[in-house]
């Protein structure tokens, strides 16, 4: 019984570690202003994109959700803590078009990037 529990625990740790490695690679690419496409992330982890996708599926994780999560965090940080233009932020975090960024911000934050910036800066720190 203890051996089985240990195996289950180790499997969970391995799965968690893989997702974390993928997220770290995504974050590195986005922070460098590069596109976090699955091919680039897979190459950074020395595997094919199909293997990366299969391993994430095994953990019930979807690649684009990980990218979306990190883009959202970077957008929040840039809007809250920098004076960079909305357009510059959009391109920096991997959007091909500022209007796509605006639509995505509406989904993430419920308003435009400019409105979110005003709102977040009015909050007490």
Where on the chain are the PLM-derived regions?
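Extended mid-to-C-terminal alpha-helical interaction segments
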Residues: 1-125
């Amino acid at each position: 019984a203890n051996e089985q529990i240990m195996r289950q625990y180790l499997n969970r740790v391995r799965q968690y570690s893989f997702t974390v490695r993928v997220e770290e690679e995504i974050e590195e690419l986005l922070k460098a202003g590069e596109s976090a496409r699955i091919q680039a992330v897979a190459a950074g982890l020395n595997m094919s994109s199909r293997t990366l996708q299969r391993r994430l599926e095994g953990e019930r994780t979807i690649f684009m959700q990980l990218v979306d999560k990190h883009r959202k965090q970077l957008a929040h940080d840039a809007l809250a803590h920098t004076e960079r233009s909305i357009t510059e932020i959009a391109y920096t975090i991997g959007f091909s078009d500022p209007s796509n960024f605006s639509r995505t911000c509406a989904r993430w934050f419920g308003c435009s990037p400019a409105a979110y910036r005003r709102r977040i800066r009015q909050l007490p720190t």
